[in-house]
Amino acid sequence: MNEKYEFCSKKWVAFANEYLQGAAVGEDLSGILVTFNEVFTDAPSHLDPDDEGRIGWYLRVENGKVEVERGILDQADLTITVDYTTVLPLARMVFEGNPEGAIEAQETMATAAAAGKMKREGNDAATASLSFMGGLHDALAQRTA
């Protein structure tokens, strides 16, 4: 059985990095400059949130290189901010072969947005050229404790 990691912990982000580095092998990333950031509010204190109670991870593609780190960028092409507790069940949910789960996730995020617990800032199409990200969610879901 694969090791599981706490959502957005250092080991979880390290796994995301390992996955994305592998998925990007052979991709032509020349000329692509993209930053993507997921930020989680009201994070558990043992995950070392910032003064505002936030943790996050980001992806930067620049000069043909993929960088994945834990942290919050001052500015990204697309930033998704969501309440940690709200997103946690979705972070564990595999969507492939699970259309009901995908619908549930969309409904949960719409409800969270309406309640002010989720927002998207920037260009929603920012990561469209990054086809190697396609399997990231499910790979992480299978490893999220």
Regions found by a protein language model. Give the residues of each.
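Feature captures hydrophobic
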Residues: M1-A145
